[in-house]
Amino acid sequence: MRSPHITISLVFLFFLFLIIQTHQRTIDQTHQIGSNVQHVSDMAVTSPEGKRRERFRVRRPMTTWLKGKMIGANEHGVPSGPNPISNR
């Protein structure tokens, strides 16, 4: 019969090995994915269609968007004064 210390040590080393292997695979996959993404983004930036689209893109300023939201909020007719029902 083996000593419990040896068994526990072997189990611990086995789990440590699994953790290291999993971590190493994750790092390898991350580097692989990162290099692929950079390659795709370089192609997208250098494409002539992308440059044309970016030139004519019009962005609305945030204040216009907020004004539109405020106008939409006033349309539903909520009175701004005191509640006449609660004053009876």
From Swiss-Prot:
GO biological process annotation, one example: secondary shoot formation
Record keywords: Developmental protein, Differentiation, Glycoprotein, Hydroxylation, Secreted, Signal
PTM-bearing positions, type Hydroxyproline: 79, 82
Keyword Signal part of the UniProt annotation: yes
GO cellular component, one term: apoplast
GO MF term list: receptor serine/threonine kinase binding
Signal peptide: 1-24
Residues carrying covalently attached carbohydrate according to the record: 82
Region feature Disordered, mapped onto this chain: 69-88
Name of the protein described by the UniProt record: CLAVATA3/ESR (CLE)-related protein 42
Name of the gene this protein is made from: CLE42
